[in-house]
């Protein structure tokens, strides 16, 4: 259900943008999916296509790009990637992080110094990286 809510927000944003730009058609929507949130791209794509049906976005190409999750320790400055520690997380913890990415601090620590005080440098959320539109001739 979380993916449907994300898809709805993406579609509403794309349609609002297209309307403000007086677009006649949305040709493509590029969406970046942060690795940390572990969003199911297939479900988001299906939901987006359903939500775009009957709008100027129907038939738009949907492009996904996964953004690797990178962390930086505030204590020692060490940087590491989620894939380096992901195998230590069980399915329940991954589900918790999926819904509330901020809880990652409770389950992951810096592999260098053990601190839980780190920042997510990239790969946390979901955002629209681009919307390609078509305008009527003369606009």
Curated annotation (Swiss-Prot):
Keyword Transmembrane (UniProt): no
Molecular function as annotated in GO: nickel cation binding; zinc ion binding
Any one biological process term the GO annotation gives: protein maturation
Entries under InterPro entries matching the protein: Hydgase_Ni_incorp_HypA/HybF_CS, HypA/HybF
UniProt entry keywords in alphabetical sequence: Metal-binding, Nickel, Zinc
Residues binding Ni(2+): 2
Gene3D superfamilies reported in the protein's UniProt record: 3.30.2320.80
Binding site for Zn(2+): 73, 76, 110, 113
Keyword field contains Zinc: yes
Family recorded in the similarity comment: Belongs to the HypA/HybF family.
Function: Involved in the maturation of [NiFe] hydrogenases. Required for nickel insertion into the metal center of the hydrogenase.
Record protein name field: Hydrogenase maturation factor HypA
Organism in which the protein naturally occurs: Pyrococcus abyssi (strain GE5 / Orsay)
Gene: hypA
């Amino acid at each position: 259900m979380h993916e449907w809510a994300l898809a709805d927000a993406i579609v509403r944003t794309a349609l609002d943008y297209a309307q403000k730009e007086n677009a006649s058609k949305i040709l493509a929507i590029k969406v970046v999916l942060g690795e940390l949130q572990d969003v199911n791209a297939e479900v988001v794509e299906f939901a987006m296509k359903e939500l775009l049906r009957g709008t100027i976005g129907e038939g738009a190409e949907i492009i996904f790009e996964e953004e690797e999750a990178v962390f930086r320790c505030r204590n020692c400055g060490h940087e590491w990637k989620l894939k380096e520690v992901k195998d230590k997380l069980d399915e329940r913890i991954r589900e918790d992080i999926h819904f509330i990415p901020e809880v990652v601090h409770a389950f992951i620590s810096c592999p260098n110094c053990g601190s839980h005080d780190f920042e997510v440098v990239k790969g946390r959320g979901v955002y629209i990286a681009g919307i390609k539109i078509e305008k009527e001739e003369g606009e």
